Amino acid sequence: MSSNMVAILYLFSALLFIFALRGLSHPESSRRGNIFGIVGMVIAIITTLLFKSVLSYVEIGSAILVGGAIGTFIALRIEMTALPQLVAAFHSLVGLAAVFVAAAAFYDPSAFGIGNFGSIGKSSLIEMSIGTFIGAITFSGSVLAFGKLQGIVSGKPIVFKFQHIINALILIFVIFLIFLFVSNQSPNIFWTIILVSILLGFLVVIPIGGADMPVVVSMLNSYSGWAACGIGFTLSNNLLIITGALVGASGAILSYIMSKAMNRSIINVVLGGFGGEQAASSTSDNSDKIVKQGNAEDAAYVLKNADSVIIVPGYGMAVAQAQHALREMGDILKKEGINVRYAIHPVAGRMPGHMNVLLAEANVPYEEVLELDEINHDFPMTEVSFVIGANDVTNPAAK
């Protein structure tokens, strides 16, 4: 296959990825967006395998089959409530893949056309170092995020003195190591960069509380994209550069939107200080309370005299798997002629779009699910705001 044909196919795949992002921006077109993404990835993989000299198609095919089987098994077994930790786990694999590709390019540069071992061009070394640095941070940060979301690690923020200063010093040390690596190409320095970057990834995520995990997941998504973009420059792969930049930019923009919605700074997210604030509670009552049980009909009966209801779901709804009961309540209210809508805060749940996924699973009509900017101005004219499992969003100081 000629290089011109490869460039055309890569460009076509990149366009399909852009269409996929466009489709995934709305629930009604999300299925079409997924199809665009799948077709684009298949074309990219086939083009790469036909253009590059592959040592063994059997090995590549076996790896694809094993990976596909594992992915299919996970997709069939995973519950909707566990999607955030699944996304975090996938991000960790992207970061780890970037590190492995960088290591392969460093130890066998001739296979990638960037020189020979010990005599790699400085520009390639810089690109390799940046991709490795971001990939290692993405890997360790995503592993810790997975642990927090899965409950393996405490979801509470872990804060200590001089945290930002320590993170900044580690970052400066990594930059210094990169300069050393570019100058002498030492394998020891290469692996030191990886280990220190992994440490920095942990330190960036540990001060972030569970309620703020959507921003973390989005930011790690951005990191994984930039890691892939950096490795794309090392491999001179235009498609990897384009797709990495798409993922990196979209993740960064989404993180900014969510941070702004919570009246917090995106800089705190990057530095690992997001969600570390703890509000003082005026009362501390740990005594057992009586559980009041009810069903969708009971809740609808209380609200039936209202003309309009806005339902604000949060992570508590996901934990209780109450989305189906919530939809039943909404259906009952609509039969009474009540205007029912769902308000989705950008950081509700544990990942971007978490509430949208759960409400879609419960077959809530797409037109009733509105984002913050679309519905925020309607709250003063609405009789009832029904908050379910979203107290940390409506009042971040609540405990």
Each language-model region and where it sits:
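Structural signature of hydrophobic alpha-helical transmembrane segments
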Residues: 1-14, 51-69, 124-139, 185-196
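C-terminal ends of transmembrane helices
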Residues: 16-29, 68-87, 142-157, 200-213, ...
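Cytoplasmic-side transmembrane-helix entry/capping segments in multi-pass membrane proteins
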Residues: 31-40, 60-64, 82-94, 157-168, ...
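Transmembrane alpha-helix boundary signature
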Residues: 48-61, 73-84, 99-117, 184
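Transmembrane helix-loop junctions at the membrane interface of multipass transporters and ion channels
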Residues: 104-118, 182-188, 215, 222-242
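Mobile "lid/hinge" segments at catalytic clefts and subdomain interfaces of large enzymes
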Residues: 209, 223-267
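Membrane-interfacial segments at transmembrane helix termini in multi-pass membrane proteins
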Residues: 246-306
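Structured cytosolic domains appended to multi-pass membrane proteins
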Residues: 287-399
